[in-house]
Design a protein with these regions (language model features):
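Cell-envelope/extracellular polymer assembly enzymes that use nucleotide-activated donors
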Residues: 15-18, 37, 49, 187
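Glycine-rich, basic loop-to-helix element that forms the pyrophosphate-binding segment
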Residues: 77-93
Length: 327
């Protein structure tokens, strides 16, 4: 590995990383933990930019934030959803790299430092790392790469969360998060990856995901579940619309991601609704888009097994009987 920094401060003192923190209903203590986890990193004030986007919270935390650091950029806007809050942050981001952090989560210092070292010493467009619900982690010097985003997506299932990747802002161009959906990451992340020419991966668990009752991903009521499923389905169709405009290699990579999302959708319909009629309606729509039966590909053993099971009405009924409803 090179010992000379690649992305050091430029002549205009451009920050190395812009951290975009989105905040809505988290407690002040939790938000404080989030921001402190960024301040604890080995970045000087000129190397970091912290942007907190308040998406219409009942209480403004500006005084508490300024008590932590005077250079925090705080923006308050009417509630428009997570995607638009992130877009607001991107409009203000001046760093060479961008890191998204949800206000109820944290970066884990020792392992995130490994990610920072990659962008300091390698010509990376993106660093992929892992999340955890534990605060005690062990740093690993295991960076692998570089590989293009197209190649990575062709041979790997990817995680949709945009919070577990650190990316160079220049690869964004005009890409932004969709508005008004619960699955903005799933639509944004694969498109961003295809734009990356050099991806480094690490097994460092650098992002702490705090499980919270009442959060978007843990709502219990049926209406909310149905909306989640409908949004996920529309994301698949929007990604599919752009496939024909991609070069051959990028198209193959995106088709794998679409197949993965289609499998996830079918699985979630089964476990979140346990409703055969609802499942059949979803499968009919996927079929109309040429997405069901699932493509006959050797992506993973789990994918091949699930494809065989869902290809027959008997297999689908068996899944409905055996897969437990998510509680």
């Amino acid at each position: 590995m090179s010992t000379q920094p690649v992305y050091s401060q430029n002549k205009e003192d451009k920050p190395l990383v812009s951290f975009i923190v989105t905040y809505y209903s988290e407690s002040i203590d939790i938000l404080r933990d989030c921001v402190n986890s960024i301040l604890a990193l080995s970045l000087s004030e000129t190397e970091r930019q912290i942007i907190v986007v308040d998406d219409g919270a009942d209480y403004s935390p500006i005084n508490e934030l300024l008590a932590l650091s005077a250079d925090i950029i705080y923006v308050r806007q009417p509630n428009q959803g997570l995607g638009q809050a992130r877009n607001t942050g991107l409009a203000l981001a001046e760093g060479s790299f961008v890191q998204f952090v949800d206000g109820d989560d944290m970066l884990l210092t020792s392992t995130y430092e490994q990610c920072l070292d990659i962008i300091r010493y390698q010509e990376a467009d993106m660093v992929l790392f892992e999340s955890t619900d534990k605060t005690t982690v062990k740093p690993l010097a295991d960076a692998q790469g570089p590989v293009s985003g197209t190649e990575y997506m062709t041979h790997n299932n990817i995680h949709g969360s945009v919070c577990t990747l650190l990316f160079h802002k220049d690869i964004l161009h005009d890409l932004r998060f969709p508005k008004g959906t619960l699955h903005e990451d799933e639509e944004f992340t694969p498109q961003l990856m295809l734009r990356a020419e050099s991806i480094y991966t690490t097994h460092n668990k650098a992002y702490y995901y705090r499980k919270r009752e009442g959060s978007i991903m843990h709502r219990r009521d049926r209406r909310w579940r149905i909306r989640r499923l409908a949004d996920a389905e529309q994301v698949i169709y929007r990604l599919q619309e752009g496939v024909d405009h991609l070069p051959v290699k990028e198209r193959i990579a995106m088709e794998r991601r679409i197949a993965q999302l289609s499998m996830d959708l079918i699985y979630n319909v089964i476990t979140l609704t346990h409703d055969e009629t609802h499942l059949n309606h979803v499968l009919q729509r996927l079929s109309q888009h040429g997405l069901f039966p699932l493509p006959d590909k050797d992506y993973t053993s789990k994918y091949k097994w699930f494809r065989r099971m869902t290809n027959s009405s008997f297999g689908r009924r068996l899944l409905l009987m055996t897969l437990r409803l998510k509680r």
